[in-house]
């Protein structure tokens, strides 16, 4: 109780079971800035992978991954700005909140695309290249039908989609980068604690954003280091 009273201005009460948490003004600002500052680095990083691509398939993969990465931060930032400054536009806010949830599914699929597209995989793993996008489409349909109704189910879908391709990727003969992949996944999982702690921990959602940013950076590093050329090769080809 003393903790809540001390940080009352930085945190509101928990959301109802089928409702959405209402952040304080401080939390709104933190939610916006923690992802807004990552938009430009995401764009630059995506462009770098595209420039380092050797062939058409690598370029397509870099484009898919880059679009997912940039979309995550852009859509999240726009939603939090609308939620903060234009909350009276209920329909607009609701639409952007749905987009914010949907883009997570496509970001997960895009994050695995480089590993599934650019590494030699077995027959089962090759099917995962397409199945993961079917899961993303299924998640999108779920958001349309049951947005904010079954929060635990939604979280289960995110975690299932995050772990299912990992089981296939770990079966690759070339295991370079798997430690970084696992490390990033662990960071995402730890961040989920804060994702579900609005109204319990001040700035919980903004802290979740920082976990997402850190995990995404670890995964980007692994993709850049093990699936695309090194900076030395890049400079040599300029």
Curated annotation (Swiss-Prot):
Give all cystine bridges in this chain: none
GO cellular component entries: Golgi apparatus; late endosome membrane; lysosomal membrane
Organism (species): Rattus norvegicus
Q: Where are the transmembrane segments?
A: 29-49, 62-82, 102-122, 124-144, 152-172, 175-195, 199-219
Give the molecular function GO annotations: pore-forming activity; protein kinase activity
InterPro entries given in the database record: AdipoR/HlyIII-related, Hy-lIII
Q: What is its main location?
A: membrane
What ranges are annotated Cytoplasmic (topological domains)? Answer: 1-28, 83-101, 145-151, 196-198
* Gene this protein is translated from: Mmd
Tissue specificity, in the record's words, reads: Preferentially expressed in the brain.
* This protein's name: Monocyte to macrophage differentiation factor
